[in-house]
């Protein structure tokens, strides 16, 4: 019986894989991204908890609303991670971020279970990044960004992201509990790898202000 209960709770517990992602994003001064990851983890955890045995008391919202925000948060996390990788200056950064916030909300409401809810943001972000980087390469007549970014950050990050989506859409029927839990872990790892080592746009006038985990929680709530 204990094994059955543990198996049912595993998707909920595996959503905690986003906690290190939140912590790392905060340390790298990607505060907005950290709040999005925390938002995603919160709704993913409660969405799965509502399916758990005897945990219906945790369903503080309707099941479909929890599902909506868990999927919306996941897609938005992909978008903000890729926009952080693009390293835009203002006002492009806030403009593209808000573009994702609005369009992903509409797309998720229209069809939250299709491939498009994830492929749309990923494809659009990839196109935007490609245009910017190709322009940079043309200006400097060389590779942009550095080769190490491709080998240590982009390559591994995209591999884990591709693995996560493959698990999500093609292998969950094998064993939903374990496959979906690995999906959470692969997705969280992808976000960590894609985030730059430091947010250059956060300012460098002295030491950055401390943003605690409790502050992030209060902001999201």
From Swiss-Prot:
Record topology, Extracellular segments: 1-3, 51-64, 111-113, 175
Keywords associated with the record: Cell membrane, Golgi apparatus, Lipoprotein, Membrane, Myogenesis, Palmitate, Transmembrane, Transmembrane helix
Induction: Expression is induced in muscles in response to muscle injury. Expression is induced in muscle progenitors response to muscle overload. Down-regulated by in microRNA miR-491, which binds specifically to its 3' untranslated region of Mymk leading to its down-regulation.
Domain of life: Eukaryota
One protein family per Pfam: DUF3522
Post-translational modification note: Palmitoylated at the C-terminus; palmitoylation promotes localization to the Golgi apparatus.
Lipidation (S-palmitoyl cysteine): 217-218
BP GO terms, sorted: muscle organ development; myoblast fusion; myoblast fusion involved in skeletal muscle regeneration; plasma membrane fusion; positive regulation of skeletal muscle hypertrophy; skeletal muscle tissue regeneration
Location(s), subcellular: Cell membrane; Golgi apparatus membrane
Membrane topology type: Multi-pass membrane protein
Transmembrane segments: 4-24, 30-50, 65-85, 94-110, 114-134, 154-174, 176-196
Subunit structure: Interacts with MYMX.
Record-given protein name: Protein myomaker
Gene: Mymk
């Amino acid at each position: 019986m204990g094994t059955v209960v543990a198996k049912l709770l595993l998707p909920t517990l595996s959503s905690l894989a986003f906690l290190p992602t939140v912590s790392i994003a905060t340390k790298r001064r990607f505060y907005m991204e950290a709040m999005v990851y925390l938002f995603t983890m919160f709704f993913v955890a409660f969405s799965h908890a509502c399916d758990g045995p005897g945990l219906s008391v945790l369903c503080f919202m309707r099941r479909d609303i929890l599902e909506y925000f868990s999927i919306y948060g996941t897609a938005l996390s992909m978008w903000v991670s890729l926009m952080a990788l693009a390293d835009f200056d203002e006002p492009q950064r806030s403009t593209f971020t808000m573009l994702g916030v609005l369009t992903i909300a509409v797309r998720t409401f229209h069809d939250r279970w299709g491939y498009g809810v994830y492929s749309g943001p990923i494809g659009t972000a990839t196109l935007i990044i490609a245009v910017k980087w190709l322009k940079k390469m043309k200006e400097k007549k060389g590779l942009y960004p550095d080769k190490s970014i491709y080998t240590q950050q982009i390559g591994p990050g995209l591999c884990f992201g591709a693995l996560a989506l493959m698990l999500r859409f093609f292998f969950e029927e094998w064993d939903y509990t374990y496959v979906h839990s690995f999906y959470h872990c692969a997705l969280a790892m992808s976000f960590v790898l894609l985030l730059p080592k430091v947010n250059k746009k956060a300012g460098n006038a002295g030491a950055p202000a401390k943003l605690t985990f409790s502050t992030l929680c209060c902001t999201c709530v």
